[in-house]
Amino acid sequence: MPRRAKPNKSPSPGQRGILATGLAAWLLVLLAASGCRTPQPAALQRFEFEQPQMGLPFRIVLYAESQARADDAARAAFARVAALNHVFSDYEDDSELTLLSRSSGSGRPVPVSDELWRLLNLAEATSRRSQGAFDITVGPLVQVWRRARRQRELPTPEVLAEAKARVGWQKVVLDPHARTAQLRVPGMRLDLGSIAKGRALDEALHVLRAHGVPRALVTGGGDMAIGDAPPGRDGWRIELAPLDAPGAPPTRFLSLRNCGFATSGDFFQHVELGGKRYSHIVNPHTGLGLTDHSLVVVIAPDCLTANSLSTTICVIGPERGLALVAATPAASARVVRKPGERVEVTESPGFARFDEK
């Protein structure tokens, strides 16, 4: 049973919010809503639920007519996330993704489920659009850098070269007619961390809607699937706090509904090795953790799209990244970089339309 909070019929902007994991000093999602008040049914109550999923705390905030409906909807949403994790996880030994990775180099195509096919297909398209900057075959490199962080020691050029030999999105062969995937090179390891969470959040929101709860927000690790606005509000309120003054009051407010929201970057997830700072995000071309200190926010029609774009922008930078966003329908992005002591902010032309009115 998911842990739940007591219902609150009239939240205020000062109430406790959802902290985006790893970005708490910069991004705060308030559980109160924002915007001008409009007449809404008074019967709806606000409920919160939290449960560990995909190695992160997943939180659901929803408005429902009763505790029973809220409980049923949240339970079903968390169950859906757990089921997807068993497909997408690269930690579980018996997940569908792990079994596919184990088949690498076998020379045989492997039938995959509709859920895994959807992500593999999106990954291939995003890799092509980004000229390989987005690449789910980075698993061997991710493993190298996880070990480097634990041991506090840079990987050797030989270790990186060996891992890179097993990386490359073109090494995955998809057959759309047979719905199969084949990993050409032995020792390949797929890592869906850049998109699996977005898909899971979208699906959780879809389940809530199917249970008659459209006024909801689902968040995990700084990413969100956002449904209809809370009662009497225009949208869910997002605070953007200044990066150059941690702990300072927020300087900007967004109002969001019916969209996906994703964050990526190294401002709060990095490691210093050999006197240099490296991001947890790996550049598939160089095999190295990113060293360009950046933080990216993407707003898109769904969290899956936002998730894939935010990671890609971190790798290719603001100029190419915002061009990619401009070519994606209804997507906008904000890129914050910190070269030296100054903070640089670049935004899509349409990002300002999400500002709270």
Give the location of each predicted region:
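Mature catalytic core of soluble alpha/beta enzymes
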Residues: 2-11, 18-357
